[in-house]
Structures are given as C-alpha cells and as structure tokens.
Amino acid sequence: MKIYDCFMFFDEELILDVRLNILNEFVDYFVIVESKYDHKGNKRELIFNIENYKKFENKIIYLVHNDLPYNIKKLNKRDSKNTIGLKSFHNANERENAQRNFISYGLKDADNEDIILISDVDEIPNLDSVDFDKIKSKIIVFEQKFFNYKFDLYVPNFTWFGTKAIKKKNLKSPQWARNIKCKKYPKYR
C-alpha cells in the first residue's frame, strides 16, 4: 500500500516546502496540480520549479491544469450586481473543482488499495500515529489546527476538518472527497 498526498498549488512556496518536509517520511508520492488560470479565470504564469524541491523530485508527480471548465456562466453587462456576484462565485468554484479533480490524472498508477490524501496545500495532516492498515473505515477525516493564512496566526478553540484519506477504490473524485463532512467518519489529529 502506497500513500499519495494530493493537493493544488498556487503560490504557497513556503507552505509547500514545509508540507513536503513534514510528510516526506510518510508519503510515497506528492501529486501537485498547478493551473494556468487563477480562480477568477485570469491567465497566470506557472511558478512551481522542481529545482527548488530536488530532495523530493522522485516523489513528486507534477501536473499542469490547462483548461477552463465547460460550465462557466457568462457575465453579461445587463446582469445585476447580485447576479454577477452569484455567477462569479459559481465560476470560481467550478475552476477550483476542475483543478482539484485534475488530481485524478496523477493517480493513474495507484493501486486500488493505495491511500489517497486530498487536501489544500496548507492543510498538513499529522500522520505520526495513523496506521492505515488497521483502519476499516472507507473514509478518514483529519481534525486539524486552524491557522489563519500564516503559521503565527493560530486560532485556538477552532477545529478544522480538512484532509480526507480514502483508498483509491473508494474515491469517486477528488472534489467529492473534499466535500465529505466529518459527521459519520473517524477523525484523526
């Protein structure tokens, strides 16, 4: 059984470096998806550079998401501010979901019993005490500390349910896993 750590990347180079170093001993592969578009649909330059992460080069599966989703709602000049806001929110979610679902291309060589971790780059699970071989649940939700954008902005008494772990055979899509709520699944810190 291998462990694939899968997430999207935008410009969080420091957090990416921290994540790779913390999870390196537990993870077999890091699946990193970077998009040529931001969530507003603007074209952007790719910034991921494998030269900055040579230590992890053999573990990194780097994918570039080139496409915009097909179901983007066109903004019209006659739309009300409310409609523009709703369409913009919808479009941003569709772009994010398409980028996250692109993770699937990095899992083509994964076996059905391999563990797939789905999260954002800044949601770093604590894998120190997790024995995936002993867990019988189909889905695991990680209970994580919440930091508001920076490591020094810890929010006490607030629990974040971020990373999801699931065997490949049970994974419908990366976004499906992301949307799972923690109500009926075991939680790990």
Locations of regions flagged by a protein language model:
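N-proximal low-complexity "stem/linker" segments adjacent to membrane-targeting elements
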Residues: 1-25, 33
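Short loop->beta transition adjacent to catalytic acidic/histidine clusters or analogous donor-positioning motifs
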Residues: 3, 24-38, 55-61
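Short, solvent-exposed loop/turn segments at secondary-structure junctions
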Residues: 10-13, 36-38, 67-70, 122-124, ...
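Short, glycine/acidic-rich beta->alpha junctions
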Residues: 11-15, 22, 99, 113, ...
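Short, well-ordered alpha-helix to beta-strand connector turns
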Residues: 27, 57, 113, 136-137
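Active-site-proximal specificity loops/subdomain of glycosyltransferases
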Residues: 37-118, 127
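Conserved catalytic core of nucleotide-sugar-dependent glycosyltransferases
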Residues: 93, 123-189
